[in-house]
Amino acid sequence: MKVADATPTPCIDFSKIQSIINPPDLLKVQLDSFHNFIQDSVPLEKRKDQGLEKVLRSAFPITDTRGLYLLEYISYSFDKPKYTVEECIERGLTYDVSLKIKLKLSYKDEADEPDWKETIQQEVYLGRIPYMTDRGTFIINGAERVVVAQLHRSPGVVFSEAVHPNGKKMYSAKIVPTRGSWIEFQTDINNQIFVYIDQKKNFLVTALLRAIGFAKDEDILGLFDLVEEVEVSSKSSKREQLLGQYLASDIIDMTTGEVVPARAAITEEIIDQIVAAGYKTVKVMKTTSPEKGVDKSVIINTILNDSSATEEEALEIVYEELRSNEAPDIDAARSFLERTFFNQKKYDLGDVGRYRIQKKLQNELAELSAYLEKRPELKELSDAIYERILQTISTYSEEPIGEDILVLTHYDIIAVINYLIKLINGMAEVDDVDHLANRRVRSVGEQLAAQFVIGLARMGKNVREKLNSRDTDKIAPADLINARTVSSVVSSFFATSQLSQFMDQTNPLAEMTNKRRVSALGPGGLTRERAGFEVRDVHYTHYGRLCPIETPEGPNIGLISSLSVYAEINDKGFIQTPYRVVENGQVTDKVVMLSAEDEENKITVPVSIELDENNRIAAESVQARTKGDYPLVLAEEVNYMDVSPVQIVSAAAALIPFLEHDDGNRALMGANMQRQAVPLLVSEAPIVGTGMEAKVARDSRAVIVAEGPGVVQCVTADRIEVRYDLDPENNTVSLLDPDEGVKVYKLIKFKRSNQDTCISQRPLVHNGQRVNAGDVLADSSSTDNGELALGKNVLVAFMPWRGYNFEDAIVLSERLVYDDVFTSIHVHEFESSVRDTKRGEEQFTRDIYNVSEDALRNLDENGIVRIGAEVKERDILVGKITPKGESDPTPEEKLLRAIFGDKSSDVKDASMHVPAGMKGIVIKTKLFSRKKKIGMDVKERMEAIDKQFDLKEADLRSRFAKWMKQYLNGKKSVAITSDKGKVLVPEGTVIDEALLAKFNGLPFLESIDLSKGIVSGAKTNENVVRLIREYRLKLKDLSDERENEKYKINVGDELPPGIEELAKVYIAQKRKIQVGDKMAGRHGNKGVVGKILPIEDMPFMEDGTPVDIVLNPLGVPSRMNIGQLYETSLGWAGKKLGVKFKTPIFSGATYTEVQEYLEKAGLPGHGKVKLFDGRTGEQFHDEVTVGYIYMLKLSHLVDDKIHARSIGPYSLITQQPLGGKAQFGGQRFGEMEVWALEAYGAANILREMLTVKSDDVIGRNKTYEAIVKGQNLPEPGTPESFNVLIRELQGLGLEIRIDDRVP
């Protein structure tokens, strides 16, 4: 075995700016989200109210309608996965864990009894849920999948504007909850505010305020400070002032009982009536607010047009508009309104929604609160309404009301109306829906929580039905719960959701990008047909959060993005990016994470600005960034500074050297095409890199990294053993490990990826080598010395070559084929299964009737091809026979066949063959069977397993005892209590051998309350508690493992339903580069191989060195990706000097530095040299740009695309041949091709094309027969598509007859 060369090439770093912080783990997005949801490593008592815990708490308690039963939730736990990740992939199973919840069922005989009669506590199985691997993926039915994060509209309030055709602006405010009805307030052309609930019918906003409790006009007007008390007098000047105004409250003449209603326009007669009634002052409506002169006529217009005048009338209006029928009574209407907005089970703003409303309306809410303080009568009414809302919440929900109320309150509604008034007056701005403050990310944990909510709601419904149908006979929680309810919802999410994707595993970068992707599509998101330009465009808030470069090129452009390198997602789902704090021009080392909302209105500067020796901004004024603008500001005004030049882009874009010299469109292609690069036979890191290569390789988990300081103990081709240094005070590895700190790393060997590329690891270390934390122990098929290596450094010349590199085609040297430079390995998987059919069971066998011995030479006794066999198309991979026969055989026939072995008559050959166009070497075979073939009998195997695990448990106990003695012997204890509060060991007890022996007993350990500690020393306590927790965990793991091993023996191999045996064959193919393969650089410079030339025909330099690849120079200027020329020149200098370069984006090598290194290497500074034609030996007329460029071979290989058909499958209805390689289809002969044949007058060929070669069923059979017998071809018949047309016309009720009489 050859160990890979681990001596790294010296590297020259061009970075001008050192980043103050390192980027976070690039898979953190997936791993943190899932583990925060599942909280499996958190002790029960420390679990936060989030994720699964929160969902389960909200789903319980469940009661029946009679109030006799109460089912409460206590806690949940998981078992270990039954199979490893590799076993699940091989067997086509799901890598999952079983979820168990502890429930308590209480019951009583009569509902009015104060206490519960009896309670039963029980652990109930709730189904199996897929578990995330340490690479951030899920294994679902044997396929590795990724759940992509979704970018959707954040709950909260959004203000927008529209322009009516008459030019008037109309404003709207939409309150979007996490769950419940959408409510929209909208102004119209008549200057009124309407309310739309769930986009249904509308009613005036005053009706809603009235229905909530502000019953009188005066109350509503008072809320907006629109009531004015005016003196009434007989003086003409005062009378004129009153004329035309509207009354704010009713005027009652006590003597006559006459009423002048509110909203009445004041006339001379009304003034006389008011004076006659003895009123000195009267309350009228005013249109502007006195302090600020704000026009609030919209409220007055709305009130004047409101048909309701009392709370009851308003409730009826709201009910009728929403339910489209009359309310049975007022109480029903009121409870309907309360259920819609104040019941937390029906209407939930969520933490995010409440936070967004408070943040957006903070000024309006503060102003409202201050105003109510000045108006005691309104404050009293408002407080009474608030109390009623709180009462409603507690009626519908048993949960205590937290700090923030997650339902809508009247304060929110009034604040929204106030903000709308500000918008009308031009005193506020509408929201930008594409701003990242209004869009949040739903990562995997939140999406799973939503599925659990659906599943538990269904389960709750079933439980209630069961409880209601039960009499008071004794039942246990397990009788009520159906595990399928929840697990089926979760399984269908992983299998069918648009956001659960088959992982792109072409190379480690593709894998990682897939996990860091953010999609605006999916359930509850946008659809690509409806998404406009604005939502797809780059927004200024994307800076440092979403990559402006990496996005797909097709219909999904802009809808699918990638997280930037430093971006993180906070607990509310908003994307944050780090900034250094700047105070009065002084750049500090304090780093803060800012969301788009936090950054709004702040002034930030790039990391490239000049600082003096004291870290102050050197210039007096600098160009900064604020919102979408780039003003020149004073250094003292700057708030924040970027942390790194890489901050703006994603990992894939950060791998493109000289990105700053490339056009954005080409950089996009470069970032996308790196993900399609096929791992090559021998990986080679780029000479010109950006410094991100190692980060991507580590964070994608492609390489194996040392976890701490230690010594390599053993290295083979497929395993590395490292003995880590044990430090009892600060242990990086488990103290309870049976191997005393030795960790074994199994290397992946020739594993097939999802895209059929080959994943294989090779060791980089040797026996006895000392390693430290973070050292790379093993490389992957796409890494070189721990750096991402997707392609090869090849000698390039930019020149035309006899037209063969026209239109981006590429001319290659034959050397690249001979030396396997661009050769890749592809592993294909084939599977065949045995099922139990109605006519009997199928069988794997090499005994196949009517097949020559030569065809069976590579099959073993089970009929499976041997490892190492070279196979080509049509070779048998798995021999299989399947029963045939029109009728089921009688018992007598079965007996006779069993005796005489007459197999030929009743079985047919169903063997699996190598498909067309495939050849390769069998590298692995697997046979799984439900009927396990065991050498020893089951009982003996069980006993052996018990013995093995007893030894492991005894070893674990002795290790635990040893470390406990080391930590505790002779120390004084604190008061050790049980989890029920009972004192187990009094305070001050000296811990001796006897007490330590007690600790070894599991019942004693299980009952201890660890939160109080064991001894007084903090560090010792921490170590002991960690040791006890780990001991408990390891014992449980051993117990689970024991059960799993026994289960496997009893059951045999677990296979998908209906399959008795499963055979898998893996074939490895070596694919050399050939004409038609697609290649690309990292700058979006892609092309297809147009010609492979003999080495002697390639252009060569003065010293006779032929170039490896010739690219067309016309592919550079119009594409504006000059980065490839910088890379070419610097790569050549690096090759000559034997060094590598690290040129990070936006702070890398300059033109002068590239020239400097070219000259240092003895090369011309402009990078151009004389070249000679390999065919004639003559010098080319001009000098040519030559150098080393990093080229990738992409997964668009001609072998997978080339396809031809003679006969094959036909479409069922039209009887025309199918299309596409996957269906073994034909080439479409379209209308333009028909024109071409018409133009040549090729009538017979045309007739053949449209009939016998297409869908004339009878004609094609006759033609085939004629060809076989060597006869003349018959006349074509009627095409089937004509019959289809006739049937369709008949389906429309038209009678069509074919008149085939010749006139």
Swiss-Prot record:
GO terms of molecular function: DNA binding; DNA-directed RNA polymerase activity; ribonucleoside binding
One BP term from GO: DNA-templated transcription
Record-annotated membrane-spanning stretches: none
Enzyme class: transferase
Disulphide linkage map: none
GO cellular component terms, A-Z: DNA-directed RNA polymerase complex
Gene3D superfamilies for this protein: 2.40.50.100, 2.40.50.150, 3.90.1100.10, DNA-directed RNA polymerase, beta subunit, external 1 domain (2.30.150.10), DNA-directed RNA polymerase, subunit 2, domain 6 (2.40.270.10), RNA polymerase alpha subunit dimerisation domain (3.90.1800.10), RNA polymerase Rpb2, domain 2 (3.90.1110.10)
Entry keyword annotation includes Ion transport: no
The reaction(s) this protein catalyses: RNA(n) + a ribonucleoside 5'-triphosphate = RNA(n+1) + diphosphate
Keywords: DNA-directed RNA polymerase, Nucleotidyltransferase, Transcription, Transferase
Pfam families: RNA_pol_Rpb2_1, RNA_pol_Rpb2_2, RNA_pol_Rpb2_3, RNA_pol_Rpb2_45, RNA_pol_Rpb2_6, RNA_pol_Rpb2_7
Subunit structure: The RNAP catalytic core consists of 2 alpha, 1 beta, 1 beta' and 1 omega subunit. When a sigma factor is associated with the core the holoenzyme is formed, which can initiate transcription.
Protein family per UniProt: Belongs to the RNA polymerase beta chain family.
Function: DNA-dependent RNA polymerase catalyzes the transcription of DNA into RNA using the four ribonucleoside triphosphates as substrates.
Name of protein: DNA-directed RNA polymerase subunit beta
